[in-house]
């Protein structure tokens, strides 16, 4: 008999006052795993761990990051059925290679360029610039964490 389970881990804290926050971190990590936004090890590392901790302790900070980056793009995608955020995620996963992004999305590379230009217009952040790309990548992860944090 086979059983599947998603387990979320939190950081360690010796202070029992932190228990509620740590349980919340574990819940968010498990929700991310269920959504396949992160693999089991990924939720324990780097940026994911930081964003999970922020979501558990100060979710309004993730909301502020979201509002200042991806909110207008997600709204545009929702109204028009476009895939700007999906294209951005694929572009970042593809090491910012237009040809690889186009192939992964079954698109022409000019379509990818157009979508990235449109994302730039909507967000004010250019995914071709390293500083903006870093902020957009963080915002994508923060959005996934915020969605997982709302799941109960």
Can you name each region flagged by the protein language model?
Residues 1-152:
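Cytosolic nucleotide-utilizing catalytic cores of signal-transduction proteins
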């Amino acid at each position: 008999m086979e059983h599947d389970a998603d387990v979320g881990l939190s950081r360690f804290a010796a202070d029992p006052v932190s228990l509620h926050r740590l349980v919340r971190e574990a819940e968010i990590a498990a929700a991310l795993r269920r959504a396949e936004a992160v693999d089991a090890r990924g939720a324990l590392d780097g940026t994911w761990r930081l964003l999970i901790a922020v979501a558990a302790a100060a979710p309004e900070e993730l909301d502020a990051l979201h509002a200042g980056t991806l909110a207008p793009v997600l709204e545009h995608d929702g109204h028009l059925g476009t895939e700007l955020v999906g294209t951005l995620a694929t572009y970042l996963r593809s090491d910012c290679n237009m040809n690889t992004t186009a192939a992964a999305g079954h698109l022409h590379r000019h379509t990818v360029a157009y979508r990235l230009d449109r994302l730039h217009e909507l967000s004010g952040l250019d995914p071709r610039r390293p500083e903006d790309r870093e902020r957009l990548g963080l915002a994508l992860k923060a959005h996934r964490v915020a969605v997982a944090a709302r799941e109960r």
